């Protein structure tokens, strides 16, 4: 039987490792481009793992770390140029809420079916992340988005979907869905060891 103190130490260690992984992926993920149009982001995978293994607050923490590290990347300069408060609020809120919601969904479904719980959490994370990003774009950056959309001759909605969401969301969603069985395996191995 694992003692309460040991279990807390293991969780803290796991959270520290996942925090480091999120930081590295958040920083270097922006340098991996898909056809020059979108940046690949793998940070939501350890966010889902942390949210499932350590709880919703750990997921929120990991999402917040991802957002905070983004501020150190070259991509952040564009958004800061539009609105510093808007960028800070949008980026931190989308990461924190993605991790929190993923953890809450996992916790809600875990007792019924762990496989469904992890896949659902892996879907919820990028949906919330992208949804909050779009809301932030409308609230804080709408004038700029309108100008960009007009220059392309398309609607604001089409511009948001094509240029700001586009392949990045599809990649994040598919990556999370495809790696869910791996995440589930990690969960099962950890459960057997406890």
Describe the role of every protein-language-model region:
Residues 1-19, 108, 139, 152-194:
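Alpha-helical transmembrane segments and their cytosolic interface
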Residues 1-61:
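Hydrophobic transmembrane alpha-helices
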Residues 7-8, 36-38, 76-81, 110-112, ...:
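Helix-boundary and loop/linker segments of multi-pass membrane transporters
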Residues 12-17, 45, 59-64, 88-93, ...:
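Hydrophobic alpha-helical transmembrane segments
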Residues 22, 26, 62, 66, ...:
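Alpha-helical transmembrane segments of multipass membrane proteins
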Residues 26-39, 65-100:
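Interfacial aromatic-anchored transmembrane helix boundaries in multi-pass membrane proteins
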Residues 108-131:
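Internal alpha-helical transmembrane segments of multi-pass membrane proteins
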Residues 128-152:
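Juxtamembrane non-transmembrane "cap" segments at the membrane-aqueous interface
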């Amino acid at each position: 039987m694992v003692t309460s103190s040991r279990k807390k130490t293991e969780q803290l260690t796991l959270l520290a490792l996942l925090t480091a992984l999120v930081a590295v992926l958040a920083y270097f993920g922006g340098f991996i481009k898909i056809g020059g149009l979108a940046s690949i982001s793998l940070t939501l995978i350890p966010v889902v793992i942390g949210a499932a293994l350590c709880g919703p607050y750990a997921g929120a923490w990991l999402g917040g770390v991802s957002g905070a590290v983004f501020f150190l990347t070259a991509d952040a300069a564009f958004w800061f140029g539009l609105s510093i408060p808007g960028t800070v609020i949008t980026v931190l809120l989308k990461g924190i809420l993605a991790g929190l919601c993923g953890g809450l969904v996992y916790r809600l479904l875990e007792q019924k079916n762990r496989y469904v719980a992890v896949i659902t959490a892996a879907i919820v994370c990028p949906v919330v992340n992208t949804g909050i990003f779009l809301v932030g774009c409308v609230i804080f950056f709408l004038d700029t988005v309108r100008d960009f959309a007009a220059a392309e001759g398309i609607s604001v909605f089409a511009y948001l979907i094509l240029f700001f969401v586009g392949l990045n969301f599809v990649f994040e969603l598919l990556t999370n869905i495809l790696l869910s069985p791996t995440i589930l395996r990690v969960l099962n191995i950890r459960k057997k060891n406890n």
